[in-house]
Amino acid sequence: MNLKNRHFLKLLDFTPEEITAYLDLAAELKDAKKAGREIQRMKGKNIALIFEKTSTRTRCAFEVAARDQGADRTYLEPSASQIGHKESIKDTARVLGRMYDAIEYRGFAQETVEELAKYAGVPVFNGLTNEFHPTQMLADALTMREHSGKPLNQTAFAYVGDARYNMGNSLLILGAKLGMDVRIGAPQSLWPSEGIIAAAHAAAKETGAKITLTENAHEAVKGVGFIHTDVWVSMGEPKEVWQERIDLLKDYRVTPELMAASGNPQVKFMHCLPAFHNRETKVGEWIYETFGLNGVEVTEEVFESPAGIVFDQAENRMHTIKAVMVAALGD
């Protein structure tokens, strides 16, 4: 299967077999790193990392993955990038494409990363946009594969919370593409767009995936092996929306009771992080003082329980991002 020089913009661009090939390569690279026998396949390559949104996991994953594989990288922080401000996306793409072997972009509009890919002449990787988070999806799929004990097409998972943005969109597409039993539990006003839902149903017709969207969180999690969530207020949204969002989503909080509603004593909890699960951050303390919530989308009890596999998930960001880069650029 040829993934050489491929852009990695959204899972809709790939077949189930191609997505599985990325997962297989990630598992192979992970094993090699842990065994101390990793072979550098990207020596002499240069990668530009464009971040219009700040990042911990995505940046670190790209940096470490590139370094492990012998590639050099340039980090363009939010304040340093001229993209779309003093220089058009098209021009930025053509400049960086002359200097670098690949470009990673983390920012706002999906259209921006698509335009970079159109004009760069080198592979472009989507580190996150408002609409999609494809590298996170590979990490999530690898993590579920490691913990499931059965093939992904025999695995059920649910996403509960605000499903309008990149995580809800991407998990719905991931499940559809890989033939999984995927459920979205959210108020209907916070479901993915009609276009995303239609794309998921189209993929499911090809793969045999089962898709459920429901406003009942308990119905969504019944029988699943994994429960995913994300923050209720996204980066850049004003503090004023917190009360409205808490009122809307209070029944979708991942509590021990919701975990138990799965009926599966082995159910696992997943979160792309960062998570508001206690008062140990400035935002977490502000939420507690303002709304009386110790933990928002997930309780501390669930987050810190043996069911929580969020740090396996976070580690797998690096291995799966490495797989994307090696597949595109590796010798």
From Swiss-Prot:
Residues given in the record as L-ornithine binding sites: 166, 230, 234-235
Keyword Cytoplasm: yes
Annotated GO CC locations: cytoplasm
Key words, A-Z: Amino-acid biosynthesis, Arginine biosynthesis, Cytoplasm, Transferase
MF terms (GO), sorted A to Z: amino acid binding; ornithine carbamoyltransferase activity
Binding site for carbamoyl phosphate: 55-58, 82, 106, 133-136, 272-273, 317
This protein's name: Ornithine carbamoyltransferase
Subcellular localization: Cytoplasm
Enzyme's top EC category: transferase
Cited HAMAP family: OTCase
Lineage: Bacteria, Pseudomonadati, Pseudomonadota, Betaproteobacteria, Neisseriales
InterPro entries listed in its UniProt record: Asp/Orn_carbamoyltranf_P-bd, Asp/Orn_carbamoylTrfase, Asp/Orn_carbamoylTrfase_sf, Asp_carbamoyltransf_Asp/Orn-bd, Orn/put_carbamltrans, OTCase_ArgI
EC number(s) from the headed UniProt entry: 2.1.3.3
Pathway terms, separated by semicolons: Amino-acid biosynthesis; L-arginine biosynthesis; L-arginine from L-ornithine and carbamoyl phosphate: step 1/3
Key word Cytoplasm present: yes
Record-linked Pfam families: OTCace, OTCace_N
Biological source species: Neisseria gonorrhoeae
